[in-house]
């Protein structure tokens, strides 16, 4: 079995979506079999936080990882970029508690990964690709996530908003041998989005302090506040990005059709936990 890591280090600096605080992230090559993991270089002893399902500590409007007192929030876009581009092993050094939002998508991470390229690593690994043995279904009201046995790994998502500019959207993306190219073109550029009527409430709740019209799409009853969109269905493509990032915490993607509708980070992580339990 072969794995991949970065050929060289990459770095970005920017503000976090919820904290509004600027942080610097440096992603370095890592040894075969080490996986993807964060290092809080701003804290004493530089604690390591593995990008694993067991490390999830919170899922309110983003996915947060933690180990002991150390945590890293809003990890999903960066992890989606690494997984989507085939980076199995990466040391992610960060000098704060939240990953920079950058332009609201994974595009800048993906461009940096593509610029430096990957190195192939030979590894003896007991964790091989496996098939989901039976359907998994988790729902909350009319929202759901599912993993269905399939001949390929595929991610499909549906959303439904009572705003004409969004409405009902579906999108499906397959994981293939050319996935790094298709991910970079079809999924990574899709930006996070918010609803105009929710912004004031979220800000009063201490959230989205770093959100702006430069790093998030905003939709109101009269349409998009800050067009143009990169895709006609950019919102649902971004949900695929979130799903890929959250399920990347498994370390690898089982062969299955992952399906979600009106889901959340919480439901994504519940699905990952169920898959992990089945694999054990």
From Swiss-Prot:
The job of this chain, per UniProt, is described as: Catalyzes the hydrolysis of UDP-3-O-myristoyl-N-acetylglucosamine to form UDP-3-O-myristoylglucosamine and acetate, the committed step in lipid A biosynthesis.
Superkingdom field = Bacteria
Q: Does the keyword Hydrolase apply?
A: yes
* Active site positions, chain numbering: 265
Q: Its gene?
A: lpxC
Reactions this protein catalyses = a UDP-3-O-[(3R)-3-hydroxyacyl]-N-acetyl-alpha-D-glucosamine + H2O = a UDP-3-O-[(3R)-3-hydroxyacyl]-alpha-D-glucosamine + acetate
Q: Which UniProt keywords apply?
A: Hydrolase, Lipid A biosynthesis, Lipid biosynthesis, Lipid metabolism, Metal-binding, Zinc
Q: Which family is this sequence assigned to?
A: Belongs to the LpxC family.
Which InterPro entries does the record match to this protein? Ribosomal_Su5_D2-typ_SF, UDP-acyl_GlcNac_deAcase, UDP-acyl_GlcNac_deAcase_C, UDP-acyl_N-AcGlcN_deAcase_N
State the HAMAP family in the record. LpxC (MF_00388)
One annotated GO biological process: lipid A biosynthetic process
Q: Which cofactor names does the annotation list? A: Zn(2+)
Q: Does Zinc count among this protein's keywords?
A: yes
Instruction: State the organism's lineage.
Output: Bacteria, Bacillati, Cyanobacteriota, Cyanophyceae, Nostocales
The cellular component terms of Gene Ontology attached to this UniProt record, alphabetical and capped at eight, are: membrane
This chain's protein is named UDP-3-O-acyl-N-acetylglucosamine deacetylase
Its Enzyme Commission number(s) read 3.5.1.108
Q: What residues does Zn(2+) bind to?
A: 77, 238, 242
One short Pfam family name for this protein?
Answer: LpxC
Which pathway does it operate in? Glycolipid biosynthesis; lipid IV(A) biosynthesis; lipid IV(A) from (3R)-3-hydroxytetradecanoyl-[acyl-carrier-protein] and UDP-N-acetyl-alpha-D-glucosamine: step 2/6
- Tell me the GO molecular function terms: metal ion binding; UDP-3-O-acyl-N-acetylglucosamine deacetylase activity
């Amino acid at each position: 079995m072969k794995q991949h890591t970065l050929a060289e280090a990459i770095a970005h600096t920017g503000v976090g979506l919820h904290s509004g605080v600027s942080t610097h992230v440096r992603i370095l090559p890592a040894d075969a079999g080490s996986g993807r993991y964060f290092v809080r270089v701003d804290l004493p002893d530089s604690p390591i936080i593995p990008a694993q399902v067991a490390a999830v500590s919170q899922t309110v409007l983003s996915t947060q990882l933690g180990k002991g007192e150390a945590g890293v929030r809003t990890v999903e876009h960066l992890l989606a970029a690494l997984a989507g581009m085939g980076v199995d092993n990466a040391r992610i050094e960060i000098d704060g508690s939240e990953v920079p939002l950058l332009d609201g998508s994974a595009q800048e991470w993906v461009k940096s990964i593509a610029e430096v390229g990957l190195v192939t690593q030979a590894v003896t690994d007991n964790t091989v690709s496996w098939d989901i043995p039976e359907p998994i279904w988790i729902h909350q009201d009319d929202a759901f996530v599912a993993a269905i046995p399939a001949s390929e790994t595929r991610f499909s998502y549906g959303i439904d908003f009572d705003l004409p500019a969004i409405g009902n959207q579906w999108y499906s993306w397959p994981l293939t041998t050319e996935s790094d190219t298709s991910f970079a073109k079809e999924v990574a550029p899709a930006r996070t989005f918010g609803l105009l009527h929710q912004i004031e409430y979220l800000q009063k709740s201490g959230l989205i302090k770093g959100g702006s019209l430069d790093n998030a799409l905003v939709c109101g009853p009269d349409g998009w506040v800050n067009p143009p969109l990169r895709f006609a269905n950019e919102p649902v493509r971004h949900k695929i990005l979130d799903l890929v990032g959250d399920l990347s915490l498994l370390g690898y993607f089982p062969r299955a059709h992952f399906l979600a509708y009106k889901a959340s980070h919480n439901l994504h992580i519940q699905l990952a936990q169920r898959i992990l339990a089945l694999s054990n």
